[in-house]
């Protein structure tokens, strides 16, 4: 069978003589409009919102990026606009040196660069030079990120070069340039949305756009944009009951599904323990076991904090709990080794 590629635009079927789309063609959602253009904007008067779809970091053949965004921001300044939605969910990258007029335009817009006024829709095709763009918007603007995680590491290798394998002579392309927009402790497999909104196949088929709907219906009272920072602030104020209540609420809320609370709490516990703040560390580790009782790692970490606090009996109990949850894995092995050390210390 001869190989072929189906006709497509940005991963979606392009209907033609031999291919048809499952999507209802009567109407077209904003993110699929004018796909012959790299970017376009539209005013949505009901919500006083300017919507921009930008799907490559390249100049469109009819209008360069600086000219396009100059027009967008002039429209915002001169009209009754309350929100800007920048949709880059289809944007696979390009030339990240072309990001500057987008970022500076947002920074300079007093009307838009405010919490709850500027939204960036991201998704599984947001990649490469567009990862640089969303990183910069995260660093320097009040963007609220909506949708699904990007498909690129926050810091990443890019800009490939052709090399030839020495034995097979096969050509391959390897990325060589390290792009680091954020410090290493903020690196992650992706940029996660602050407001998680998933899109189903049925949504696509029926022309629904839950991500855009979430932007248009956003209320800043409904969302904590920095969940970990929020919990840390409560913790530092000594409001431990509120820390626990808020942590339970947010870990059960699908809007925060891409926040790795377990890992963040675990790291916070170790930071406190390494600073000799043992009671605070114990509180954080105990909270993590309440939130994630089936995680062997949370019990292993709590056991270590108990051991270092002189609470050996509790350490033994919690290490055994970790082994029970992970009898054949690395965490279980770590707990068994810790128990051997505890036993040898008691014997000595």
Where are these regions (language model features)?
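Canonical tetratricopeptide repeat
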Residues: 267, 301, 334-338
């Amino acid at each position: 069978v001869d190989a072929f590629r189906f006709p497509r635009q940005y991963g979606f079927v392009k209907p033609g003589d031999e291919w048809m789309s499952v999507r209802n063609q009567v109407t077209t959602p904003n993110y699929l409009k004018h796909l012959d253009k790299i970017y376009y904007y539209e005013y949505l008067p009901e919500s006083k919102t300017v919507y921009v779809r930008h799907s490559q970091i390249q100049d469109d053949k009819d209008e360069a990026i600086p000219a396009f965004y100059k027009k967008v921001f002039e429209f915002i300044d001169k009209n009754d606009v309350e929100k800007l939605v920048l949709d880059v969910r289809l944007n696979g990258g390009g030339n990240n040196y072309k990001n500057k007029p987008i970022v500076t335009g947002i920074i300079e817009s007093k009307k838009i660069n405010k919490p709850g006024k500027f939204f960036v829709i991201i998704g599984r095709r947001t990649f490469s030079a567009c990862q640089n763009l969303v990183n910069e918007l995260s660093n320097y603007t009040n963007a609220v990120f909506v949708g699904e995680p990007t498909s690129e590491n926050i810091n990443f290798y890019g800009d490939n070069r052709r090399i030839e394998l020495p034995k097979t002579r096969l050509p391959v392309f390897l990325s060589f340039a390290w792009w680091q927009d954020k410090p290493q402790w903020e690196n992650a497999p992706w940029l996660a949305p602050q407001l998680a909104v998933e899109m189903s196949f049925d949504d696509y088929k029926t022309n629904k756009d839950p991500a855009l709907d979430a932007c248009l219906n956003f209320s800043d009272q409904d969302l904590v944009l920095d969940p970990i920072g929020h919990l840390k602030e409560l913790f530092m104020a000594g409001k431990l009951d509120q820390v626990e209540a808020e942590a339970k609420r947010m870990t059960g809320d699908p809007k925060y599904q891409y926040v790795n609370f377990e890992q963040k709490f675990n790291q916070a516990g170790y930071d406190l323990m390494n600073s000799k703040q043992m009671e605070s560390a114990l509180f954080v580790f105990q909270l993590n076991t309440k939130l994630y009782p089936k995680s062997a790692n949370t019990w292993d970490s709590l056991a270590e904090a108990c051991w270092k606090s002189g609470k050996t009996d509790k350490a033994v109990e919690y290490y055994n709990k970790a082994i029970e949850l992970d009898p054949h894995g690395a965490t279980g092995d770590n707990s068994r080794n810790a128990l051997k050390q505890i036993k040898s210390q008691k014997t000595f």
